[in-house]
Every structure is written in C-alpha cells, then in structure tokens.
C-alpha cells in the first residue's frame, strides 16, 4: 500500500504547513486526541490531571509533547515510506515503555487529519486528506508489524 510520488508531494506540502508551527499543531492534535478519546489520557501520567480543553491549552508541557510527537512523525513522513529504522525505534519505546495500543495511533491519525483540515482548509482538501490518511495508515501498519516482532499485543 505504497503512495505515489504525487501523493507523497501532497503529504509533504501539507506537512510544510505543520512545520510553520509544530508545537501549536501538536498541542491541538493532542487536545483533539484527549478530548475525543479520554481513555488515551490514562497513558500519560504527566497529563492525567488535565480535564478540560482549556486546561490542556494552558499546559506548556502538553505543547512541548505535541512538538515532540509531530517532529518525530514529520521525520518519518519525510522518509516517504522508507522509515524502517525510525519506526523500529519508535515502536520499541511505544510498546515496551509507554504501552501505546495501535488503536491509539489510529485515534491520533484521525486527530492529525482533523486539525490539518480545520487549520488549513484551502491547502488540505480531499486529495491531500486521502494522501495523508494513506501515509498515516502505512506508518500505523509498520508500527503494528514492529509491535508483533516485539511481542506486544497492543
């Protein structure tokens, strides 16, 4: 399920919008994730106390973590599917240390697409959304494959 060159161009053009404010986009993605799927918040001891969108918006730690998440994802997307080393490292930490189920990766993927569309509607139309969805699915499938190698049933 690879992406065409044209699809990768759409993905990376959209990601260029994220890179103008990685921390801000990351914070919004995490807020969307945590408010839409409150069970995901339980995996983050540092953020469990944040109960409302306003509290999350005011959290510098959440903003920093959003920056970390989207910086890592951006590095993976820029590999255009040739991200084995990056995914292996990420899967090891997410399986062994953080215990993040694959389903949560699907939730955050949906949050990313929602935030990009909300913030950049004219630059993130149906074609770009479809391409990003495919790129994130490729990432999730590769994470799931690594989880299996690691014996993590997430």
UniProtKB/Swiss-Prot annotation:
Residues bound to O2 are 65
Q: Where does nitrite bind?
A: 65
Q: Which residues carry this modification: Phosphoserine?
A: 4
Check the record and name the PROSITE patterns matching this protein: GLOBIN (PS01033)
Disulfide pairs here are none
Modified residues annotated as Phosphothreonine in this record: 68
Boundaries of each Globin domain copy? 2-148
Any Pfam family the entry gives: Globin
Q: What is its EC number?
A: 1.7.-.-, 1.11.1.-
| Superkingdom in the source lineage | Eukaryota
According to its UniProt record, which reaction does this protein catalyse? Fe(III)-heme b-[protein] + nitric oxide + H2O = Fe(II)-heme b-[protein] + nitrite + 2 H(+); H2O2 + AH2 = A + 2 H2O
Q: InterPro entries annotated for this entry?
A: Globin (IPR000971), Globin-like_sf (IPR009050), Myoglobin (IPR002335)
Q: Where in the cell is it found?
A: Cytoplasm, Sarcoplasm
Q: Which GO terms describe its molecular function?
A: heme binding; metal ion binding; nitrite reductase activity; oxygen binding; oxygen carrier activity; peroxidase activity
The enzyme's main class, written as a single word, is oxidoreductase
What does the entry list as the binding residues for heme b?
Answer: 94
- Keywords on this record? Cytoplasm, Heme, Iron, Metal-binding, Muscle protein, Oxidoreductase, Oxygen transport, Phosphoprotein, Transport
GO cellular component term of the entry, any: extracellular exosome
GO process terms (BP): removal of superoxide radicals
**Cross-referenced PANTHER family:** MYOGLOBIN (PTHR47132:SF1)
Q: How does it assemble?
A: Monomeric.
UniProt similarity note: Belongs to the globin family.
Function of this protein?
Answer: Monomeric heme protein which primary function is to store oxygen and facilitate its diffusion within muscle tissues. Reversibly binds oxygen through a pentacoordinated heme iron and enables its timely and efficient release as needed during periods of heightened demand. Depending on the oxidative conditions of tissues and cells, and in addition to its ability to bind oxygen, it also has a nitrite reductase activity whereby it regulates the production of bioactive nitric oxide.
Q: What is this protein called?
A: Myoglobin
Protein species of origin: Capra hircus
The taxonomy runs: Eukaryota, Metazoa, Chordata, Craniata, Vertebrata
């Amino acid at each position: 399920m690879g992406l065409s060159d044209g699809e990768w161009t759409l993905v990376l053009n959209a990601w260029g919008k994220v890179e103008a404010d990685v921390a801000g986009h990351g914070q919004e993605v995490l807020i969307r994730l945590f408010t839409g799927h409150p069970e995901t918040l339980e995996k983050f001891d540092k953020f469990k106390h944040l109960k409302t969108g306003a509290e999350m918006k005011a959290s510098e730690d959440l903003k920093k973590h959003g920056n970390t998440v989207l910086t890592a994802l951006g590095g993976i997307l820029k590999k255009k599917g040739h991200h084995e080393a990056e995914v292996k490292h990420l899967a090891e930490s997410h399986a062994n240390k953080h215990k993040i189920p694959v389903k949560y990766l699907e939730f955050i993927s949906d949050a990313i697409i929602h935030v990009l569309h909300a913030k950049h509607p004219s630059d993130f139309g149906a074609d770009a959304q479809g391409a990003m969805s495919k790129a994130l699915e490729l990432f999730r499938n590769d994470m799931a494959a690594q989880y299996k190698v690691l014996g993590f049933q997430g």
